[in-house]
């Protein structure tokens, strides 16, 4: 949700021209022989373990170390690489996510409950943070075993960060490619269910591509379907899909609601046609309650608010339709929660829902490039008590709170087979 991004992205994304020259493959373009050849091209890679350096979530700065074995040698994982574009590699391995996580935890040996350890594949210190996909067993139970996230900056855990060569958002003020000071809602859901999360969401994304490098949800679906084809024993029916987008379309790109409805419907059609059965959907929050709209006209606020309300009715209708068809659909009313969260934060354990925790006093995407101090009120109370981290995006405490509400027994998600 970054306003007036085109000039900034031109400077930020040196790989954008490469992306334009290398169109993303579709699953139909990957032959069975290429799949077999790729899977047989076995190699190994190293694991980069990231962690928060501070004991407080008020400080999002991170650092990393190579994962090591108990004898001090470098820990490696066997598998194979594949990519649809030159800089977006994924490493497929039979090593489980739990084994990799445990090796990172043992290597770092941190007595820090807020370390928020995460890990990526990397061949050398100059590599990007590449996703590690753990292949499924040939014999697997009929239950959810992973989460796939599609969407925008509310779900992005590092894609735009990689594309900007680790500069956007600034890692000293935003947590390692997250538009927050820590984990986002999809990560909290995955952790609560002890499942790996695979992120296709991109900060700034709309339903369709914007400015070359901002991969829209339509192309995110294409990318997911293509990468999934290279995975061994993968069953889409055993994946929980999260889908949230639309705010960028209305706030930043002035797209009409009919266009966004079409993108949303197409994403669900393509996913279900590919075998997806389990979905976590959400209504859009009223973005005009975010601090950035202190700097907007009432006309702009009314226009965006009306679009959000209309889009939410469509999302509800889509959820009802697919549920009637027998799909496992959980629709969480994020809009209703944010209404009470922003109007009465104290009732939810927060103290401030009108100001950002970071000391930012304008609405400008340029600010994502800089390091910012905390607002004095946030420094006093702690980021855990603020609803918003910057002028647009929630704190990790808000993300965690929303995820907890999603996981409550009163919601359908609690009834899924995990």
Curated annotation (Swiss-Prot):
Keywords: Cytolysis, Hemolysis, Hydrolase, Lipid degradation, Lipid metabolism, Secreted, Signal, Toxin, Virulence. CDD domains: fatty_acyltransferase_like. It is found in: Secreted. There are two forms of LDH. The LDH(S) may be a protein in which 13 residues of the N-terminal of LDH(L) are deleted. One of its GO terms (molecular function) is lipase activity. Disulfide bonds: none annotated. This is Thermolabile hemolysin. Residues 1-19 form the signal peptide. SUPFAM superfamilies: SGNH hydrolase (SSF52266). Phospholipase hydrolyzing both fatty acid esters of phospholipid, i.e. it hydrolyzes phosphatidylcholine (PC) to lysophosphatidylcholine (LPC) and then LPC to glycerophosphorylcholine (GPC). GO terms for cellular component: extracellular region. GO terms for biological process: killing of cells of another organism; lipid catabolic process. The active site is at residues 153, 390, 393. Belongs to the 'GDSL' lipolytic enzyme family.
């Amino acid at each position: 949700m970054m306003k007036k991004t085109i000039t900034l992205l031109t400077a930020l994304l040196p790989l954008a021209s490469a992306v334009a020259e290398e169109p993303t493959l579709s699953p139909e373009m990957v032959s069975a022989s290429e799949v077999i050849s790729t899977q047989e091209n076995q190699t190994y890679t190293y694991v980069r373990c990231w962690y928060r350096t501070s004991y407080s979530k008020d400080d999002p700065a991170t650092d990393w170390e190579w994962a090591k074995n108990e004898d001090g040698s470098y820990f490696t994982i066997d598998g194979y690489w594949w990519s649809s574009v030159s800089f977006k590699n994924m490493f497929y391995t039979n090593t489980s996510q739990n084994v990799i996580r445990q090796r990172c935890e043992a290597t770092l040996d941190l007595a820090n409950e807020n370390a928020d350890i995460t890990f990526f594949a990397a061949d050398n210190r100059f590599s990007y943070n590449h996703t590690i996909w753990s292949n499924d067993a040939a014999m697997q139970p009929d239950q959810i075993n992973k989460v796939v996230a599609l969407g925008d900056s509310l779900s992005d855990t590092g894609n735009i960060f990689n594309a900007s060569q680790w500069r956007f958002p600034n890692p000293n003020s935003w947590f390692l490619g997250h538009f927050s000071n820590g984990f986002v809602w999809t990560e909290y859901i995955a952790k609560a269910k002890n499942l790996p999360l695979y992120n296709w969401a991109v900060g700034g994304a709309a339903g369709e591509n914007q400015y070359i490098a901002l991969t829209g949800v339509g192309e995110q679906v294409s990318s997911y379907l293509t990468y999934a084809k290279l995975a061994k024993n993968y069953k889409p029916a055993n994946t929980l899909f999260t889908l949230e987008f639309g705010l960028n379309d209305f706030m930043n790109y002035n797209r009409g609601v009919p266009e966004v409805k079409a993108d949303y419907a197409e994403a669900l059609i393509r996913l279900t046609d590919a075998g997806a059965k389990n979905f976590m959907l959400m209504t859009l929050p009223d973005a005009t309650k975010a601090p950035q709209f202190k700097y907007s006209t009432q006309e702009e606020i009314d226009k965006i608010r009306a679009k959000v309300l209309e889009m939410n009715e469509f999302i509800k209708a889509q959820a009802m339709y697919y549920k009637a068809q027998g799909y496992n659909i959980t629709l969480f009313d994020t809009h209703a929660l944010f209404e009470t969260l922003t109007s009465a934060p104290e009732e939810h354990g927060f103290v401030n829902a009108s100001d950002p925790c970071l000391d930012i006093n304008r609405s400008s995407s340029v600010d994502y490039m800089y390091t910012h101090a905390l607002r004095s009120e946030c420094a006093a109370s702690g980021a855990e008590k603020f609803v918003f981290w910057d002028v647009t995006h929630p704190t990790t405490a808000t993300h965690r709170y929303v995820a907890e509400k999603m996981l409550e027994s009163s919601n359908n998600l609690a009834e899924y087979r995990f």
